[in-house]
Amino acid sequence: MIYEGKAITVKALESGIVELNFDLKGESVNKFNRLTLNEFRQAVDAVKADASVKGVIVTSGKDSFIVGADITEFVDNFKLPEAELVAGNLEANRIFSDFEDLNVPTVVAINGIALGGGLEMCLAADYRVMASSARIGLPEVKLGLYPGFGGTVRLPRIIGADNAIEWIASGKENAAEDALKVGAVDAVVAPEKLQAAALDLIQRAISGEFDYKAKRQPKLDKLKLNAIEQMMAFETAKGFVAGQAGPNYPAPVEAIKTIQKAANFGRDKALEIEAAGFVKMAKTPAAQSLIGLFLNDQELKKKARGYDKIAKDVKQAAVLGAGIMGGGIAYQSAVKGTPILMKDIREEAIQLGLNEASKLLGGRLEKGRLTAAKMAEALNAIRPTLSYGDFGNVDLVVEAVVENPKVKQAVLAEVEANVGENTILASNTSTISISLLAQALKRPENFVGMHFFNPVHMMPLVEVIRGEKSSEEAVATTVAYAKKMGKNPIVVNDCPGFLVNRVLFPYFGGFARLVSAGVDFVRIDKVMEKFGWPMGPAYLMDVVGIDTGHHGRDVMAEGFPDRMKDDRRSAIDALYDAKRLGQKNGKGFYAYETDKKGKPKKVNDPAVLDVLKPIVYEQREVSDEDIVNWMMIPLCLETVRCLEDGIVETAAEADMGLIYGIGFPPFRGGALRYIDSIGVAEFVALADQYAELGALYQPTAKLREMAANGQSFFGQASSEE
């Protein structure tokens, strides 16, 4: 053994060939944490010091190759001063360069996923052989960063600037054939032939058949583009990528600028330019929020896995209530492999549900995401029925009938009498108390809430609601079924609106106050879209449905009268009374036309101004900053209350619920991370400036205590520091 560590070993194979193997002990994947980087340095030094070594093959002992850097280390690392961060980055890069500069040929055998730093390590080798099943990519832009281990330097010099810009700016994973096509790898072979192919390649390089030094040289030189080619490659790309990414995600454009800046320099100077830019990105609020979001997502998945131990397997599901929602739930279950009965009392509703499932499956077929055979299999897994005849062997029933407590209670009591004693019943409700609905049941321990978001096939979140009498097994089984459906489940405790709607309605409350203060709703939409929301509140209300919003607001006002009840008529009341229900009937805040693709397209409708005139009680001068604060303070404070009330267990779950459920701007990290980014004390002071607007703007006593003690929700420095 030439070298042996906890993450890397180097052993002799044959005829001077050595194998440098990544296999991080105690982990399911390889990643570049401090330990692995340190051992990589020692392993490279050991190879350098051994005169008998004629070539190096790099392999992985895991199913994947190397998944990238250890993101859990970023939080503390990125708090360091810029100069220290740059120095640390260059120190790490020296290890990759030392590996690249070995006086023998190097071949990497990519057996599985190689992402981020994992791919950057591969780029430092002379040759890359890839299993046909493997995937490679540089996804750093998804964290608000760009490659920092030489990716912006080596990749353009290997596959050309245009291809490298596309790979780096998109952050996408690339299949083996695509990687071969652009020259990112030198060969693609069947997985079982990977080791033999790597050995063959290294032997041919050792024998001189392949000139590894000539292969290496372009990576050490300037980028081979003249001034006109550079201008065409970089300026065009910057404009296009800026349009795609938008102003809140600076990393893709900064990556292109870095490649451009470094184009006229050799490797070492180019790496210095990359390091400076990488650190600049690491210090942005967007990067800190997106890294936090990634870590929150990991925590969420870990929590969901924790339920697996007591979850029962759902082999057969059922949905009560067909139509669009029932069809969407049936589609999602069937396409992910769980057969489902779809029951309704009306044949036309069944047909509507089947049409919805068929339309969604057809869409996947058209896009090449599904074969015709798989589509047929999924359609056959949805069995429509008008009776309870086959419900005896159903493991879980999702009730998705109209949002009316009496109707739901009647339907749930009826289905309970037609299923097995251990069958779990789950109500797809957005606002009705699960404990209230459970009063109609003989086995309330088998009952939970399972709140899907519309449209079901697109929205990643499912709220699993624990009622007063819900058993842990019922909760766990519903979480497991939601995961099986490809959703991100969050367990919340019962209260009006649960987590997402309880937080959303104070946001709409801020909007209603603005409109009543004479602020143009079109302007409000533009300001909130600029802030980062996918759509403004008026447009969102039209999409949700004015009638749905009106009903939800009344439920929330009844549940939290101290702060959500408003005796004055609002914009929602005015539109509801005028039967302007939003997209569903072609007019709400906006009017709707059908575009060329048959989708609704919003247009301004002057007639709405007359409808809104009676609910405008004053004309206030309000700045864009005020608009953001009127909207965001109530949302953030209600999220704080949900955490304090134990509706949601952790800050991570609260934030991810808002990102997955209502499109909270990801680059801001969620409501609680947004408070952290401002500073808890600063946020409390900001809220106090708007105290005259009512109870929704009042910080809780506990939040004031956090402010006084200098605490934060995620226990890290503000991203503004």
Curated annotation (Swiss-Prot):
Residues 312-721 are annotated as: 3-hydroxyacyl-CoA dehydrogenase. Pathway: Lipid metabolism; fatty acid beta-oxidation. NAD(+) binds at residues 325, 344, 401-403, 408, 430, 454. The record marks 120, 140 as: Important for catalytic activity. SUPFAM superfamilies: 6-phosphogluconate dehydrogenase C-terminal domain-like, ClpP/crotonase, NAD(P)-binding Rossmann-fold domains. Keywords: Fatty acid metabolism, Isomerase, Lipid degradation, Lipid metabolism, Lyase, Multifunctional enzyme, NAD, Oxidoreductase. Its EC number is 4.2.1.17, 5.1.2.3, 5.3.3.8, 1.1.1.35. GO terms for molecular function: 3-hydroxybutyryl-CoA epimerase activity; delta(3)-delta(2)-enoyl-CoA isomerase activity; enoyl-CoA hydratase activity; long-chain-3-hydroxyacyl-CoA dehydrogenase activity; NAD+ binding. PANTHER family: TRIFUNCTIONAL ENZYME SUBUNIT ALPHA, TRIFUNCTIONAL ENZYME SUBUNIT ALPHA, MITOCHONDRIAL. Heterotetramer of two alpha chains (FadB) and two beta chains (FadA). This is Fatty acid oxidation complex subunit alpha. It comes from Pseudomonas syringae pv. syringae (strain B728a). The gene is fadB.
